[in-house]
């Protein structure tokens, strides 16, 4: 598995190891869906100004957000890897052979503010956003009520298995 982390200059999420929590949560999200592949995911930690710019550019929404997910694959159903072809050169890194799932961008400003707002730890908020985004990279969504319920259940199970509670 390749999990790369880039933290923008001057950005910090105090009191946690971003790399460790990212790796643990991402691995558990992949276990949750029984992903049969070694995967590659990149994470960028940034601030509200930068994520707002990216959100406007890619989603047409001129507003800061907590997390953006950029999946590289389309799934028939959430977590269903049966449509992934090992023969598709665009799905796998030619150097490592890892399945390229996508990119995650998280606002450190939002992590800190939401942890305080929801009354839980920064670690819990960060792990939640990683779980949420990893599920998006595996085809989950929350546009419809039934999809949202399925995704929320998955997020909670991942965090529970990691022992991360409110």
PLM regions with names:
Residues 1-127, 137-166:
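An acidic/histidine-cluster motif and surrounding catalytic segment
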Residues 130:
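A glycine-rich beta-strand to alpha-helix segment
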């Amino acid at each position: 598995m390749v999990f790369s982390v880039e933290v923008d200059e001057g950005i910090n999420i105090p009191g946690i190891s971003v790399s460790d929590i990212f790796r643990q949560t991402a691995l558990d999200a992949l276990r949750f869906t029984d992903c049969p592949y070694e995967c590659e995911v990149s994470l960028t930690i940034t601030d509200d100004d930068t994520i707002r710019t990216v959100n406007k550019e890619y989603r047409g929404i001129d507003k800061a957000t907590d997390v953006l997910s950029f999946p590289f694959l389309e799934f028939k159903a959430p977590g269903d890897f049966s449509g992934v072809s090992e023969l598709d050169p665009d799905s796998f890194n030619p150097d490592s052979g890892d399945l390229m799932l996508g990119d995650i961008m998280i606002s450190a400003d939002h992590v800190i503010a939401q942890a305080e707002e929801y009354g839980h730890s920064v670690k819990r908020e960060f792990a939640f956003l990683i779980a949420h985004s990893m599920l998006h990279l595996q085809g989950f969504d929350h546009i419809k009520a039934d999809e949202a319920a399925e995704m929320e259940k998955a997020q909670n199970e991942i965090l529970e298995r990691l022992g991360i509670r409110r």
